[in-house]
């Protein structure tokens, strides 16, 4: 089968894009019309219209050319030129292109040419034809991206830049050595002006310098990449090539400050797969170099370029670049050592137009593609590049775009999630500026971009938008400039970018007008760590660079003399200053890396982190989210940062600053003496030049700063535990007490006060005298004061929930918004009521806002769990594997599938009520039962427990079962859910409910008596009784609040268990009152049963718990009424009313046992308290229509029917005053002494309650004598 192509003769000039598009369409039509046409495979479209020689034409006027030969069928045709003249290999490409066929010993060829004079051509790569004419048509029509390009690729023409003025020396290009092979690249394409159509810029291999984008000068068209198989240069030791894996994400770009340069910025091509070891002087042992996975496909998900109008760019930019398509087999760059020691740095090396649209690092994660110029290092997101010559500054300052970073005029620039480090110092180039979103720079050094702030005399940071003009920024020589975003900068030395950290290992140098970072300084980003100081650089993305020449590959530890590089965010170590990467970093001294997720400490520093961050002396910078600082300037990472006096400056939102001219950013700023300018927000200043972070961070003058403001450091999961964490070393400075006294009038708190206040969050004091829990306590104090919703209770479960939330960067702000907005969110309120339910007779209001799950489950047919899945469950039951049974059922139960009844019975009887299961299995079983109950509520026919089983659990041997309380909660939940279900759907069928079956006073009065008996027994348990002086009472129903500070753990646990049992049994009694549709009759019957049990309760505190935990106000009124009626010498015939309460005041005596005979007034005090309970509950009975049936009550409440006037409620102010005065006189006469203040207060409160209940105006009452 022969392959052929057809070219139209009458296509016209190819300078017009529209004509080309028309010609391409005619080509397709001609191919479809030609009989026997075969799919194109390894062919080219060749435009023959410019040639003078005649071609044979068919009857349709089309030239048919056979380009296929038998010996060439298996290899693609890269370029076919059918002209008569012999063509050299270097001439087959257009003037500005470079081929990469065999470049091992050749020099790079550069040329310039007019784009308009270049013929159209097609390239064939990997047996896949790429029609550049069609490609351009697609580019203009906004269709699919170009096809991928692989080995033996030929590169399309570069844009026409001949009109651009270029001043500089390109002689360094002649010294660049080309390597031997070509690795796969991804083609990129951008739009240009209508007069000149730019093609895709593809890289040419070169040894050390990454290919620059098309925005550079045409003479600098292609900077080569290190090639795939090239060995180390002769100068360096024999280091085998490192495997690279590069996610072809966003493309880095540069912008040069030269005002005479205007070139269209193009996309940066992909780096090669493997990079030679290019370091010169350090041996690279081959046995320690691991391999890296190669096939890591990456799929671009977001557009790489923002629109021009959103970047503040000039409006005459020709067009926005197209999206870039990458091959699926493109490997990600993991480990790429770079060396630029042989590359000179020149001002005019790189010229980039200010009109270019750079990639948006904020939306698209930057790939480890590196634009590298001689002596200049640019770092994209997730990549680390280090230049031995230093970091380039622009003249008058450095401009960093709104994406994430800025560059001080002293010279350190850190990108979003990346780090740039100079091991030998900072070199200044009069005009190199790195742009993240858009860069505009003036020759004066101060420029304003859409997100960039620049000052020639200081350091300015910008988060996403920075406003700067040459005259409107605050600048102090050697000081700090604060931008509008959430950035800050310290003239003392380090600059920390968004979610990244720069750390100085104790060695910071400051140059006039900026910040210079010495070889001992470290900048650490959230996911990328670069470290110099002996040549150690780490990146979480896997790029490791060592100025000493020791590269480390992914997830393997390698150590060379003097420097250790650890990759992949796992471990990094260097003897002088290590920067652990994000997540899991461990550092030890002497250059020995530790393995992942082990905490280790080296002398001179305290490594402590919520995750796995270890620090060493001389300055350690932990990464994302969890940081501890050691002396010498340690700066924690993302979110809320702390800064030590050593000169570390974090950024992002909540920024602490150190003394010596540090200015925190927006939000809450702290200011320390020494030329610090606080930003908007609240400024807190601490003595000694220590500035706590905004909101939550604290600093110590010795360089010890606690971790992020939102991360409380507790012994359980973060910093130190008594058994497995080394103590703080002696080098950690002791934080003075004055640091607790910050601005805003915060009172001084001693260490004991702080530790007692946040006892779950503090750690035990270490043995070393110079070590203390002060930083942790201080930070915990500030965190709790400013974020009360993060307060950790004594519950370990709440500790486990709150700590991971606060460890996330920015979680404080998010939770604050939820706390403010969620209160007024009706669905959130509804869900809250679902877990915090009021008494039973109010529960029907919960259905006013149906749950989303309820709405979605309507109309779906319920089915049992499929047999195949059920067989898996039965297998676990047969194998006696309860945990597997519970876990399978947890997965299989859904709104559409319910478990069989025998399975539920097995869960209850054999797992939940088993005496041999662990607590975890019991909790899993309980959660499974709750899930089944929520999705498929039990009814009277399907319920799997009975009263006999409940009696066994509450009275017999079941009292010792560990799942007893969980089972009782499940029982009450089934009673309540069934009661509410019938109440909502079938009001008239309450007698069919489970509660009516087991708790009806008419049908099962003995069951109600059993509940009362269990309730009184739980109340009178010894463990439930606290000392009298610890009791706090409340007049209304609720849980008794008692202090348990002096109780031992075991009695305290039993006491809490009894409290849970009391609350559940009180809920059962409240259901029993409502279930018979006659609440008054039911409450009278239950009160008669209770009377004898209440008299047997020995202590007042126990009786108080009995009444305060009672949920039914009607039942409490009836019980108290019966007690008072029996205590009166002459019983009254008045019904339950206010007049009856006044009668009880002066005619009743206490029938209840007094706890002490010496304090007779306490008996009367309890009597007055019970009268208060009676009046309070009586108001609930009236206003909530509790005497009416629960079926009728809903309509009464919705219609807001006022309660009917009751006989005996028409009392007056005179009646109240007369009875209260008579009661006081009676007490004085009986006690023989004046009333104690406590009793006087309760009598006065009783009078106010009577006024309120009778709706009397207190202003008309005479002056009361107390």
From Swiss-Prot:
Organism name: Rattus norvegicus
Gene behind this protein: Simc1
NSE5-like domain as annotated region, ranges: 865-1200
Motif SUMO interaction motif 1 (SIM) per record, residues: 45-49
Compositionally biased residues, Low complexity: 183-197, 532-553, 764-777
Motif SUMO interaction motif 2 (SIM): positions: 64-68
Major localisation: nucleus
GO MF term set: peptidase inhibitor activity; SUMO polymer binding
Keywords: Nucleus, Protease inhibitor
GO CC annotations on file: cytoplasm; PML body; sarcomere
Highest classification ranks of the organism: Eukaryota, Metazoa, Chordata, Craniata, Vertebrata
Protein name from the UniProt record: SUMO-interacting motif-containing protein 1
Location relative to the cell: Nucleus, PML body
Biased amino acid composition, Polar residues: 560-571
Keyword Oxidoreductase appears in the UniProt entry: no
Region (Disordered): 1-35, 183-206, 532-732, 756-812, 1024-1052
Region (Required for inhibition of CAPN3 protease activity): 857-1266
Entry keyword Translocase: no
Primary role: Inhibits the protease activity of CAPN3. May play a role in SMC5-SMC6 complex recruitment for viral restriction. Forms a complex with SLF2 and this complex is required to recruit SMC5-SMC6 complex to PML nuclear bodies and sites of viral replication.
Compositional bias segments (type: Basic residues): 22-31
Region (Interaction with SLF2): 779-1266
Record note on quaternary structure: Forms a heterodimer with SLF2. Interacts (via SIM domains) with SUMO1 and SUMO2. Interacts with CAPN3 and CTBP1. Interacts with SMC6 and ZNF451.
């Amino acid at each position: 089968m022969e392959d052929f192509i057809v070219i139209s003769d009458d296509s016209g000039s190819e300078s017009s894009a529209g004509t080309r598009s028309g010609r391409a369409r005619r080509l397709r039509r001609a191919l479809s019309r030609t009989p026997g046409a075969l799919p194109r495979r390894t062919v080219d479209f060749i435009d023959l219209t410019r040639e003078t020689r005649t071609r044979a034409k068919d009857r349709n006027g089309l030239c048919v050319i056979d380009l296929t030969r038998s010996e060439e069928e298996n290899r693609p045709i890269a370029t076919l030129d059918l002209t008569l003249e012999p063509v050299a290999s270097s001439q087959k490409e257009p003037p500005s292109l470079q081929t990469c066929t065999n470049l091992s010993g050749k020099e790079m060829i550069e040329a310039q040419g007019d784009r308009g004079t270049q013929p159209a051509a097609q390239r064939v790569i990997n047996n896949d034809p790429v029609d550049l004419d069609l490609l351009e048509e697609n580019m203009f029509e906004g269709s699919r991206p170009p096809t991928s390009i692989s080995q033996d690729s030929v590169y399309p023409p570069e844009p026409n830049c001949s009109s651009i003025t270029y001043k500089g020396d390109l002689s360094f290009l002649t010294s660049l050595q080309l390597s031997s092979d070509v690795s796969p690249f991804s083609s990129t394409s951008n739009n240009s002006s209508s007069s000149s159509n730019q093609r895709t810029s593809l890289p040419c291999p070169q040894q050390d310098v990454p290919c620059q984008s098309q925005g550079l000068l045409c003479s600098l068209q292609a900077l080569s990449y290190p090639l795939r198989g090239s060995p180390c240069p002769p100068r360096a030791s024999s280091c085998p090539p490192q495997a690279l894996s590069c996610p072809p994400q966003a493309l880095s770009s540069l912008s040069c400050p030269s005002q005479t340069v205007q070139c269209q910025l193009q996309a940066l091509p992909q780096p090669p797969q493997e990079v030679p070891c290019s370091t010169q002087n350090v041996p690279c042992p081959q046995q320690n170099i691991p391999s890296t996975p190669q096939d890591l496909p990456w799929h671009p998900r977001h557009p790489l370029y923002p629109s021009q109008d959103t970047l503040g760019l000039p409006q005459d930019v020709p067009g926005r670049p197209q999206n870039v398509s990458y091959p699926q087999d493109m490997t990600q760059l993991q480990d790429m050592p770079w060396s630029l020691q042989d590359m000179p740095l020149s001002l005019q090396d790189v010229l980039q137009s200010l009109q270019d649209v750079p990639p948006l690092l904020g939306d698209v994660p930057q790939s480890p593609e590196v634009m590298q110029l001689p002596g200049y290092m640019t770092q994209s997101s997730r990549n680390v590049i280090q230049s031995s010559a230093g970091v380039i500054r622009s003249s008058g300052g450095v401009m960093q775009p709104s994406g994430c970073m800025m560059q001080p005029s002293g010279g350190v620039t850190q990108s979003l999630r990346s780090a740039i480090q100079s091991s030998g110092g900072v070199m200044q180039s009069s005009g190199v500026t790195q742009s993240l979103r858009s860069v505009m720079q003036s020759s004066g050094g101060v420029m304003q971009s859409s997100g960039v702030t620049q000052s020639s005399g200081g350091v300015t940071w910008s988060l996403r938008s920075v406003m700067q003009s040459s005259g409107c920024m605050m600048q102090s020589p050697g000081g700090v400039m604060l931008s509008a975003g959430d950035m800050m900068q310290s003239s003392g030395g380090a600059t920390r970018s968004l979610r990244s950290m720069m750390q100085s290992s104790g060695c910071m140098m400051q140059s006039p007008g900026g910040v210079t970072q010495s070889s001992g300084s470290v900048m650490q980003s959230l996911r990328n760590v670069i470290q110099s100081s002996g040549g150690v650089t780490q990146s979480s993305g896997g790029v490791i660079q060592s100025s000493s020449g020791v590269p480390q590959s992914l997830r393997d530890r390698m150590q060379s003399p003097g420097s250790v590089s650890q990759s992949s965010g796992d471990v990094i170590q260097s003897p002088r200053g290590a920067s652990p990467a994000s997540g899991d970093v461990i550092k030890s001294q002497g250059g020995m890396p530790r393995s992942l997720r082990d905490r280790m400490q080296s002398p001179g520093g305290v490594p402590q982190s919520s995750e796995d961050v270890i620090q060493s002396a001389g300055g350690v910078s932990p990464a994302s989210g969890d940081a501890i600082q050691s002396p010498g300037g340690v700066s924690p990472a993302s979110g809320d940062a702390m800064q030590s006096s050593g000169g570390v400056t974090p950024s992002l939102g909540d920024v602490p600053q150190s003394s010596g001219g540090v200015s925190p950013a927006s939000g809450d700023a702290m200011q320390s003496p020494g030329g610090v300018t606080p930003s908007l927000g609240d400024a807190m200043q601490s003595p000694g030049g220590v500035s706590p972070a905004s909101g939550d961070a604290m600093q110590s003058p010795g360089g010890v700063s606690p971790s992020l403001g939102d991360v409380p450091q507790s012994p359980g999961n973060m910093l130190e535990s008594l058994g497995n964490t080394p103590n703080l070393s002696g080098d950690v400075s002791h934080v003075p007490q004055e640091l607790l006294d910050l601005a805003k009038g915060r009172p001084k708190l001693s260490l004991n006060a702080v530790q007692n206040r946040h006892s779950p969050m503090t750690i035990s004091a270490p043995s070393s005298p110079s070590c203390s829990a002060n930083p942790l306590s201080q930070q915990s104090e500030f965190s709790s004061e400013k974020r009360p919703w993060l307060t950790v209770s004594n519950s370990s479960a709440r500790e486990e929930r709150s700590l991971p939330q606060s460890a996330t960067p920015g979680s404080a702000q998010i939770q604050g918004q939820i706390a403010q907005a969620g209160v007024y969110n009706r669905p959130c309120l509804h869900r809250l009521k679902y877990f915090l339910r009021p008494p039973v007779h109010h529960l029907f209001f919960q259905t006013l806002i149906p749950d989303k799950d309820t709405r979605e489950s309507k109309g779906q047919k319920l089915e049992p769990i499929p047999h195949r899945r059920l067989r898996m469950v039965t297998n676990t039951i047969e194998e006696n594997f309860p945990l597997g049974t519970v876990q399978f059922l947890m997965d299989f139960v859904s709104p559409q599938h319910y478990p069989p009844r025998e399975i539920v019975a097995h869960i209850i009887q054999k797992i939940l009520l088993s005496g041999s299961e662990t607590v975890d299995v019991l909790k899993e079983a309980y959660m499974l039962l709750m899930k089944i109950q929520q999705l498929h509520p039990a009814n009277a026919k399907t319920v799997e427990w009975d009263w006999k089983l409940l009696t066994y659990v509450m009275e017999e041997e079941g009292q010792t079962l560990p799942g007893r309380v969980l089972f009782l909660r499940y029982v009450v939940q089934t009673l309540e859910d069934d009661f509410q279900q019938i109440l909502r759907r079938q009001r008239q069928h309450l007698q069919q409910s489970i509660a009516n079956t087991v708790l009806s006073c008419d049908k099962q009065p003995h069951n109600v008596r059993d509940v009362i008996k269990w309730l009184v027994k739980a109340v009178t348990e010894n463990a439930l009784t606290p000392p009298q002086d610890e009791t706090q009472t409340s007049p209304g129903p609720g849980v008794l609040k008692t202090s348990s500070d002096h109780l031992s753990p075991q009695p305290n646990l039993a006491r809490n268990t009894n409290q849970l049992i009391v609350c559940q049994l009180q809920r059962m009694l409240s259901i029993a009152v409502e279930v018979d549709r006659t609440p008054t009759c039911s409450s009278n019957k239950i009160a008669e049963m209770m009377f004898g049990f209440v008299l047997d309760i020995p202590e007042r505190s126990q009786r108080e718990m009995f009444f305060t935990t009672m949920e039914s106000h009607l039942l409490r009124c009836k019980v108290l009424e019966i007690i008072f009626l029996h205590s009166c010498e002459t019983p009254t015939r008045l019904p339950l009313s206010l007049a009856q309460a006044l009668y009880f005041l002066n005619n009743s005596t206490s029938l209840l046992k007094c706890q002490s005979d010496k304090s007779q007034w306490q008996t009367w005090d309890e009597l007055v308290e019970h009268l208060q309970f009676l009046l309070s509950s009586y108001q609930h009975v009236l206003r909530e229509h509790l005497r009416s049936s629960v079926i009728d009550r809903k309509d009464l409440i919705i219609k807001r029917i006022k309660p009917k006037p009751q006989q005996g409620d028409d009392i007056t102010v005179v009646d109240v005053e007369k009875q209260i005065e008579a009661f006081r006189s009676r007490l004085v006469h009986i006690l023989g002494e004046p009333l104690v203040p406590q009793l006087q207060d309760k009598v006065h409160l009783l009078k106010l309650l009577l006024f309120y209940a009778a709706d009397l105006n207190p202003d008309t009452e005479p002056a009361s004598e107390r």
